[in-house]
């Protein structure tokens, strides 16, 4: 039976490239694994992942903090939409693991995985975790630093 892993994160290369490295390492270790990514259309992942040969499902998501009032409000509106999109994607893919890399793109997917009781790994690349990984680390099964 083929294992399926969904990796979420992006927006910047700091979240995305460690995820690509993880995906390639998993594929080297286990040839019978299918890796998919979830991100946004506006993030770097929309350009990089197709070139790297990975499937990308785009969702609506945006950062929640550090914005002007209207932009912040729109970000909160996108959160339930992105979560619903993520839930549909996860129900369709039925992964054995969801990996959150941090950044606003990982929030809806990891929350959906938690609601669907899919195992969650948070992958933190920095010495100080970002806000998304701090929040999501509380519901994750494992946190890798």
Please provide the spans of the model-predicted regions.
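Alpha-helix C-terminal capping segments
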Residues: 25-27, 92, 108-119, 138-139
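Short beta->alpha connector loops at strand-helix junctions that form conserved
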Residues: 58-62, 101-102, 123-126
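Conserved nucleotide-sugar phosphate-binding/catalytic loop shared by glycosyltransferases and other
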Residues: 2-9, 28-78
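An amphipathic, basic-hydrophobic alpha-helix
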Residues: 64-97, 115
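An aromatic- and histidine-rich active-site surface loop
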Residues: 43-47, 97-116
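Structural detector of well-ordered beta-strand residues that form the stable sheet scaffold
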Residues: 6, 36, 98-99, 121, ...
């Amino acid at each position: 039976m083929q294992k399926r892993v969904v990796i979420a994160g992006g927006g910047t290369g700091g979240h995305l490239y460690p995820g690509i490295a993880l995906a390639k390492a998993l594929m080297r270790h286990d040839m019978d694994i299918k890796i998919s990514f979830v991100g946004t259309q506006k993030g770097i992942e929309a350009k990089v992942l197709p070139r790297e040969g990975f499937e990308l499902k785009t969702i609506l998501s945006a950062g929640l903090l550090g914005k002007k009032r209207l932009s912040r409000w729109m970000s909160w509106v996108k959160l339930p939409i992105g979560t619903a999109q993520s839930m549909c994607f996860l129900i369709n893919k039925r992964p054995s693991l969801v990996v959150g890399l941090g950044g606003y793109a990982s929030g809806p997917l990891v929350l959906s995985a938690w609601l669907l009781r899919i195992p969650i790994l948070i992958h933190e690349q920095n010495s100080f975790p970002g806000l998304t990984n701090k929040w999501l680390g509380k519901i994750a099964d494992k946190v890798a630093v």
